[in-house]
């Protein structure tokens, strides 16, 4: 078989190079993506909930821009002109859905008894001093909406929030490439507009993360692959001292890497931060197979006596393959078993890493057993002899040095010194049963303490170093504005059951209903005085009161509902197609409405509750923010008679004392006292900045009727902004609360979500539920997925280790003994992460796979050698010493080589990859050390029969028979 393969050497070489060229050409299709959306399984509830929310409220893909002045304030005509220009131009950039800035955000005002969405800048803004004063006043008048959203507390920074379309022109998810194009176009606009000014601009959001992730990854790939290749190259040269021994293993592993990554590109599998570990992983681990083949090939050359000929050279190659192919295949299979364990993960980057890292190992294995022998076979004999003579000459020079070193080591060779050291380490920790038990117990205790300190966090921003411009900009936004992370809480009305939904008359058109139910006249006073004139509550035509919940059917407000599947004109109001008769048409679905003051009050209370409990929340804006503002505007005094009235000193002191008391007494401050005074006087309607809820405050007989008032407000106002917070402008069945987070910790996000859910369960009226969505929620969901997939992958990999070792040694006890040090290795890895404060996330979760994939080789290597030595003698200490002498140094050398290969990740621009580099190096040390301490300790303590030779088993049986 091998001889036939060698005769086809040129065919193998040409085919291998052709395949490499083909997959190398595929690399031009590489697609780099690093967004939460791409990481999330698209079939998951979290992802689908996000898509539904974007359908109802608009895109949640946000790009933020902050502009900071070194002067006293950003509110100057010059700076506002810059913001206006930037706002206008960005609106024309491809893939931009909307932009919010101080230049175009709505400011709700009252006009002729109605509501109007005006502008913060005012209708006739010209940049005068009066205009600037008016802008400042408007910002103060609605601080819940604007403060830290478009301007900082110190007034030196303004913020622009750009929403990108979630899908491209083909209807596909807007990928990183298009996001970055939009970002670069926007950056050019800002650079031009800010030229000559002192404004410092900062960018944050999904597109910025994608852009920085792309830049960092390309930089890493260009640096780290050559670096790890150099490390492997040097280690190979010092191992073999020949060009063939140096270059061939490296070439094969580079070819395998091209094949693996090329297939990824051909299959349109996106390349992520996790994927960038694959080339380094394959180069560091995959070269071992070529080293095995070449080592035994050189042993075959050493056996040649006389001149090297074509025939005996082919014999040396054949000898090398025959002697090693089983060991190489077993090593490859076990490594694949470790890497493939993440195949069960629902997170696509982890799944793709698992598949293509395992594929790369298989390719390295195949090329090591085909391409390397073929290259050796076609090498001219003259060069083979020359290289071998050069190696021997170099070995002669080294021999002199080794003899000197031998004297310094007390007559021991380097190998003997290493063997003695390893044996002493084993004997100290596991030389006897008590030592083994005590050492293991201490190890477990320390490891469990560290494991409990382990945190799980999947925030992608943590992949970048804190001193990077990207992280510094995010930190600035989190400290000075509302925050750069976003969580959305969706409150929705559930579908009513048949007995809860009143029978409705669907024969009248919506247009007729609106005309009969509403009389949008002018109001001279506030809404509380004008409800009767604006609405016809008493004598609505049959069906109209039921349609809108007005009139004497006041209980309809309590049972607020909306019809689903609206179309045509009815769609504007949330009604379905009412053209068919009620007898033949299918009954429309009815939902609990979000105009119900009970639920609106509860949502507003939830906001106050969450803000008080969580420092990580920088801002909360919701549908209720608009309702409160509309209620305030419509209840502001038209004249200032009350404010102009003369009061006595006694009355003034009483008002002041009351305000002082309501503000908190000695715990209050001037701002709180002034706010309470303004409420007493209803200054600018501030006493009505609330959800209409108190029946005594409004001209209604029951709280249920206040839902009609909310509905009226919604009909009176037309604002694009409010559309982002309600799924229907007039009859909403779901509303959204936007939570701006100053933290990227998924633990904090989890606490906020659970608190919101607990509050809703306790305080929301029947028929309403709450759900979370957005980037913050998806990162939190990924955290749970990482924990689940990590647990599954570890159990799966340990199960595969158990099966492989059990089959190799034909005993389940062998599988258990072999799995113990690997299990301890994984536990120690988590311990180190816990003590070091390194989070378990998407990237660090692959370390367990690497630990098992590589560590199992050390376990099998040691156990195989131990079995061989055990067959030679019954003296277990002698067996152990000989095992260390035969395999100890090889295991240690391989662990150091792999660890050094991964250490090149310490030079990555990603902080998370630096962690992986350090952790894998630690894992290589612990896995090799445990293989050479725990395993011999267990084998010597229990002397299992699966390690005995056939002759020893028969002798033992014979001894038992004689004793009986």
Whereabouts are the PLM-identified features?
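Signature of alpha-helical transmembrane segments and their immediate interfacial
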Residues: 1-34, 373-374, 378, 382-460, ...
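Juxtamembrane segments of multi-pass membrane proteins
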Residues: 418, 422-654
């Amino acid at each position: 078989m091998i001889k036939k393969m060698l005769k086809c050497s040129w065919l193998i070489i040409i085919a291998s190079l052709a395949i490499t060229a083909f997959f190398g050409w595929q690399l031009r299709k590489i697609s780099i993506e690093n967004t939460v959306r791409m990481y999330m399984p698209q079939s998951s509830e979290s992802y689908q909930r996000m898509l539904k929310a974007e359908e109802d409220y608009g895109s949640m893909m946000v790009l933020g821009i902050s502009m900071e002045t070194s002067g006293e304030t950003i509110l100057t005509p010059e700076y506002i002109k810059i913001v206006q220009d930037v706002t206008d131009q960005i609106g024309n950039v491809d893939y931009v859905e909307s932009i919010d800035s101080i230049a175009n955000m709505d400011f709700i005002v009252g006009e002729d008894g109605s509501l109007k969405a005006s502008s913060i800048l005012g209708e006739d803004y010209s940049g005068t001093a009066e205009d600037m004063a008016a802008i400042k006043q408007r910002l103060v008048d609605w601080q819940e909406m604007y403060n830290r959203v478009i301007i900082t507390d110190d007034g030196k920074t303004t913020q622009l929030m750009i929403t990108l379309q979630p899908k491209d022109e083909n209807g596909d998810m807007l990928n990183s490439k298009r996001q970055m194009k939009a970002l670069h176009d926007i950056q050019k606009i800002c650079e031009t507009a800010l030229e000559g000014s002192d404004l410092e601009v900062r960018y944050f959001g999904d597109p910025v993360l994608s852009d920085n992730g792309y830049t960092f990854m390309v930089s890493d790939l260009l640096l780290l692959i050559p670096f790890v290749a150099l490390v492997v190259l040097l280690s190979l040269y010092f191992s073999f001292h020949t060009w063939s021994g140096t270059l061939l293993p490296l070439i094969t592993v580079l070819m395998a890497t091209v094949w693996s990554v090329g297939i990824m590109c051909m299959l349109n599998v996106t390349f992520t931060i996790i994927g960038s570990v694959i080339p380094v992983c394959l180069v560091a681990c995959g070269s071992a197979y070529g080293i095995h083949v070449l080592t035994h090939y050189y042993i075959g050359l050493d056996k040649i006596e006389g001149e090297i000929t074509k025939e005996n050279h082919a014999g040396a190659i054949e000898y090398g393959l025959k002697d090693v192919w089983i060991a190489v295949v077993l090593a490859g299979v076990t490594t694949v078993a470790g890497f493939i364990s993440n195949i069960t993960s629902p997170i696509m980057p982890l799944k793709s890493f698992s598949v293509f890292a395992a594929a790369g190992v298989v390719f390295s294995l195949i090329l090591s057993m085909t391409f390397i022998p073929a290259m050796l076979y076609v090498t001219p004999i003259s060069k083979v002899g020359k290289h071998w003579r050069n190696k021997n000459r170099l070995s002669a020079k080294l021999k002199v040095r080794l003899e000197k070193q031998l004297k310094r080591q007390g007559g021991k060779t380097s190998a003997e010194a290493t063997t003695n050291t390893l044996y002493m380490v084993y004997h100290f920790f596991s030389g006897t049963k008590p030592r083994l038990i005590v050492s293991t117990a201490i190890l477990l205790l320390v490891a469990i303490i560290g494991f409990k300190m382990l945190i799980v966090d999947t925030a992608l921003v943590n992949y970048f170093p804190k001193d990077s411009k990207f992280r510094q900009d995010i930190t600035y936004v989190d400290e000075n504005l509302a925050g750069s992370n976003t969580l959305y809480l969706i409150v929705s009305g559930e579908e009513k059951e048949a007995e809860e939904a009143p029978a409705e008359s669907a024969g009248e058109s919506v247009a007729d209903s609106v005309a009969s139910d509403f009389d949008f006249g002018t109001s001279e006073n506030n809404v509380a005085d004008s409800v009767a004139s604006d609405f016809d509550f008493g004598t609505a035509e049959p069906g109209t009161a039921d349609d809108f919940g007005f009139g004497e059917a006041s209980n309809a407000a309590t049972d607020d509902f909306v019809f689903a599947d609206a179309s045509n004109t009815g769609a504007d109001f949330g009604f379905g197609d009412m053209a068919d008769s009620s007898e033949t048409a299918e009954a429309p679905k009815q939902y609990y409405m979000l105009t119900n003051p009970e639920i609106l009050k509860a949502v507003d209370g939830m906001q106050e509750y969450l803000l008080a409990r969580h420092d990580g929340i920088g801002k909360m804006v919701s549908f209720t923010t608009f309702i409160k503002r509309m209620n305030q505007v419509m209840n502001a005094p038209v004249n200032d008679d009350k404010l102009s009235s003369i009061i006595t000193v006694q009355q003034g002191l009483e008002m002041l004392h009351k305000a002082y008391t309501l503000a908190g007494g000695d715990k209050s401050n001037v701002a709180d006292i002034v706010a309470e005074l303004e409420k007493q006087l209803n200054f600018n309607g501030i006493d009505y900045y609330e959800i209409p809820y108190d029946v005594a405050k409004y001209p209604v007989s029951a709280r249920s009727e206040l839902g009609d008032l909310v509905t009226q407000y919604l009909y009176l106002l037309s604002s694009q902004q409010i559309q982002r917070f309600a799924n229907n402008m007039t009859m909403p069945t779901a509303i959204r609360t936007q939570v701006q987070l100053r933290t990227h910790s998924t633990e904090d996000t989890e606490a906020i979500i659970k608190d919101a859910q607990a509050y809703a369960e306790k305080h929301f009226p029947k028929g309403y539920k709450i759900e979370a969505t957005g980037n913050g929620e998806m990162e939190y969901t990924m955290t749970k997925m990482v924990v689940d997939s990590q647990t599954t992958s570890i159990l799966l990999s340990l199960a595969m280790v158990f099966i492989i070792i059990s089959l190799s040694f034909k005993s389940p006890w062998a599988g258990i003994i072999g799995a113990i040090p690997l299990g301890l290795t994984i536990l120690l890895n988590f311990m180190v992460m816990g003590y070091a404060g390194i989070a378990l996330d998407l990237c660090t979760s692959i370390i367990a796979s690497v630990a098992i994939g590589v560590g199992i080789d050390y376990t099998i290597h040691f156990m195989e050698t131990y079995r061989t030595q055990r067959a030679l003698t019954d003296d277990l200490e002698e067996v152990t010493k000989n095992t260390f002498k035969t395999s100890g140094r090889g295991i240690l050398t391989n662990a150091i080589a792999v660890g050094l290969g991964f250490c090149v990740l310490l030079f990555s621009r990603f902080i998370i990859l630096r962690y992986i580099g350090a952790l894998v190096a630690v894992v290589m040390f612990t896995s090799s050390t445990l293989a050479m301490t725990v395993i011999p300790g267990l084998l010597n303590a229990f002397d299992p029969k699966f390690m005995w030779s056939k002759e020893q088993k028969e002798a033992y049986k014979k001894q038992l028979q004689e004793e009986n």
